[in-house]
Amino acid sequence: MEFVKMHGLGNDFIVVNAMEPPLLDREDWEEIAVRICDRHYGIGGDGLILLFPSDKADIRWRILNSDGSEPEMCGNGIRCLARYVYERGIVAKRRIEVETLAGIIVPEIITDAAGAVTGVCVDMGEPRLQRHQIPMVGPEGPAVNQELVVGDAVVRVTALSMGNPHCLIYVNDIDEAPVTTLGPKVEVHPAFPAKTNVEFVQVVAPDEVQMRVWERGAGPTLACGTGACATVVGSVLNGYTDRKVTVHLAGGPLHIEWREENNRVYMTGPAVEVFRGELPL
């Protein structure tokens, strides 16, 4: 099996073209993801990205976490996929429609004057704010600055969906955020029947925040694109920031804009190819 290792701000993925047999016909990708994402016994990665044909968009993808679970969306991963298909001529246009479990997502390739790819801007769609859309247990309506009992502690959270569930917790010092202690508890909290990603956020300025993430199915990662988008939406709803914000993650910055005129969220950031290889299955 040929693969390409890529990353978006250190959130790293193994990308595989499975558009033709025999890879197209395989039904054990979840097991393969666990094996090859292992950083000691496999290639190593936060997830496995698979490319398939689509009758609804230019291409269809599957993304599998390192534990074999399948999230609805992944912002950093979709940027990597966009660069992968563009540079290989699989999709011969800059604006690429991708069929995902969260609907049709549209990344757009950004190039310099010489035509080299410098980044990807992704139309991430509209945020989903109602509890049943996240999903989150509780009375219908948005979940903004709500109390959540986690063990013996009570924390204030803001929850929403960017195609996948996110729970934001605001902190005074991002370096002291309890990512690895509180994060896994909130991920599996009964309030979130599909589990949730957990973002810890420090507001720096109206146009700047810092964020750390505990990803559902992957644990702590260097970056989370949908999490950065959710962070900006939640911060606007709380009155903490403007609609155009730079989100600083452990792996680097993402530029997020929640446009008022169409209610859609746009994410701009890098996608980098690290190496290529071949692995027997």
From Swiss-Prot:
Main location: cytoplasm
Binding positions (substrate): N11, N65, G75, N76, N164, N197, E215, R216, G225, T226
Biological function: Catalyzes the stereoinversion of LL-2,6-diaminopimelate (L,L-DAP) to meso-diaminopimelate (meso-DAP), a precursor of L-lysine and an essential component of the bacterial peptidoglycan.
EC number assigned by the record: 5.1.1.7
InterPro entries named in the record: DAP_epimerase_AS, DAP_epimerase_DapF
Gene Ontology BP annotations: lysine biosynthetic process via diaminopimelate
Active-site residue list: C74, C224
The entry's keywords: Amino-acid biosynthesis, Cytoplasm, Isomerase, Lysine biosynthesis
PROSITE patterns: DAP_EPIMERASE
Cellular component GO terms, alphabetical: cytosol
Assembly mode: Homodimer.
Subcellular location: Cytoplasm
UniProt record similarity statement: Belongs to the diaminopimelate epimerase family.
Pfam family, one: DAP_epimerase
The name this protein goes by in its record: Diaminopimelate epimerase
Reaction equation(s) it catalyzes: (2S,6S)-2,6-diaminopimelate = meso-2,6-diaminopimelate
One MF term in the entry's GO annotations: diaminopimelate epimerase activity
Could be important to modulate the pK values of the two catalytic cysteine residues, annotated site positions: H166, E215
Annotated metabolic or biological route of this protein: Amino-acid biosynthesis; L-lysine biosynthesis via DAP pathway; DL-2,6-diaminopimelate from LL-2,6-diaminopimelate: step 1/1
Taxonomic superkingdom: Bacteria
UniProt cross-references to PANTHER family, sorted A to Z: DIAMINOPIMELATE EPIMERASE (PTHR31689:SF0), DIAMINOPIMELATE EPIMERASE, CHLOROPLASTIC (PTHR31689)
Source organism of this protein record: Heliobacterium modesticaldum (strain ATCC 51547 / Ice1)
